Curated annotation (Swiss-Prot):
SMART domains: Ribosomal_L40e (SM01377)
Protein name: Large ribosomal subunit protein eL40
Lineage: Archaea, Thermoproteota, Thermoprotei, Sulfolobales, Sulfolobaceae
Gene Ontology molecular functions: structural constituent of ribosome
Source species of the chain: Saccharolobus solfataricus (strain ATCC 35092 / DSM 1617 / JCM 11322 / P2) (Sulfolobus solfataricus)
Assigned GO CC terms: ribonucleoprotein complex; ribosome
Gene3D superfamilies: 4.10.1060.50
Protein's gene: rpl40e
Superkingdom in the source lineage: Archaea
GO BP: any one term: translation
Swiss-Prot/TrEMBL keywords: Ribonucleoprotein, Ribosomal protein
Record keyword Ribonucleoprotein present: yes
């Protein structure tokens, strides 16, 4: 079910995309994290910010 309401879409994007991903173990971390919560590595990246497109 695609979202058409811009306000709801913005809320979903903030919940889903404002995360950091550990490059060592793949754990999701808060956006303000400096170390991974699982393996304590400092090698973090931002989650990729693109919505999946509907194929068809």
């Amino acid at each position: 079910m695609p979202l058409t309401d811009p306000a709801k879409l913005q809320i979903v994007q903030q919940r889903v995309f404002l995360k950091k991903v550990c490059r060592k173990c793949g754990a999701l971390n808060p956006i303000r994290a400096t170390k991974c919560r699982r393996c304590h590595s400092t090698n973090l990246r931002l989650k990729k910010k693109e919505l999946p497109t509907k194929k068809g």
